[in-house]
Amino acid sequence: ALGEPIRDDAVRFVCVSDTHSAIERMRQPIPDGDVLLHAGDFTRRGNTEEVDAFSAFLGTLPHRHKIVIAGNHELSFDPVTAKYGASCTEAACNEAVAQVKRRLVNCTYLQDAAATVCGVKVYGSPWQPRFHNWAFNLQRGQALLDKWNCIPTDTDVLVTHTPPVGHGDYCVRDRHVGCVELLNVVQNRVRPRYHVFGHIHEGYGTTTDGETVFVNAAICDVRYRPVNAPIIFDVPLPEGASKDR
C-alpha cells in the first residue's frame, strides 16, 4: 500500500498510466520506489513539446529505473499515425519517429521489447484493438496475436497499453473493450506475476485471476482529470539479484 517502507528484499514498482500531459498536476504525488512504470498515453497528441515536458519531469523523480511504453495518444511514435497529413517518404517518417523517441532521455522506452531491472524481467508493448485513428491500432484477431506471441514466457511484469478483456476494461458504453487475444496469451502461456496497463480510464484499479494481478493504473478519469493515485506493488528480489543494477 502507499506509504509502506521499501523493503531490501523486494523490488518496489510504482505504476501510472494515462497521465496525458498532466503528470505534474496529479492529485496524488508519485511515491518513491525502485521502478517507475508508465503504461502509455503520457501525452495528449504526442507532439515534441509534450514529450520534452514529460521527459524533463521524469528527470526530477528519484526512481533508479523508469520504464515507459507508448499509448494510442503518442501519435508521433507510430509511423502510421505520424504520417497523417504529411507528405514525407516512409524513410523520412521513420526517421522522424526515431528522433522523437530519442527525446525520452530519462527513462527506458520499451516497444515490443524486454528489460531486466533488479533481476525482474519486464516486457512492454503499446498495441491495442483498433480505436478510431489513434496510434498503435491493430485489428482484433491474428494481427494482435502476432504481437502478443512475442512476449517471453519468463516475463515477470508485463506492461501493455490495452487491458485484456475482462480486467480493468469496462467502458462507460457498458461493454468490455479489452483484448481477447491478450488475455489468452497472459493466462495460458506467459502467466506473469503482474500485468500493468491503462487506456480505459474508468477501469482504474486491480483485479486478479488467482495467478496474475491485473493493474489498470490510469491516472486520469474520463474527463482527463489526474485524480487517481499511483498503484504500487512489491516483487520479491530474485535470488542473486541486486537493486544496484
Language-model region placement:
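Active-site-proximal segments of metal-dependent phosphoesterases and phosphodiesterases across multiple
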Residues: 82-91, 131-135, 153-191
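Core catalytic region of metal-dependent phosphoesterases/phosphodiesterases
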Residues: 16, 21-117
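Active-site neighborhood of phospho(di)ester-bond hydrolases with catalytic His/Asp-centered motifs
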Residues: 15-17, 36-41, 65-72, 110-111, ...
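A Trp-anchored, charged/polar loop motif used as the substrate-binding/catalytic surface
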Residues: 104-110, 137-149
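Beta-strand-turn-beta hairpins that frame and shape the catalytic cleft
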Residues: 4-13, 114-124, 153-157, 207-213, ...
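Short catalytic/ligand-binding loop motif for oxyanion handling, primarily in non-cytosolic enzymes
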Residues: 76-79, 117-118, 130-132, 166-168, ...
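Binuclear metal-dependent phosphoesterase catalytic core
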Residues: 116-118, 181-194, 201-245
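Acidic, histidine-bearing metal-coordination/catalytic regions of metal-dependent phosphoesterases
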Residues: 1-25, 61, 80, 234-245
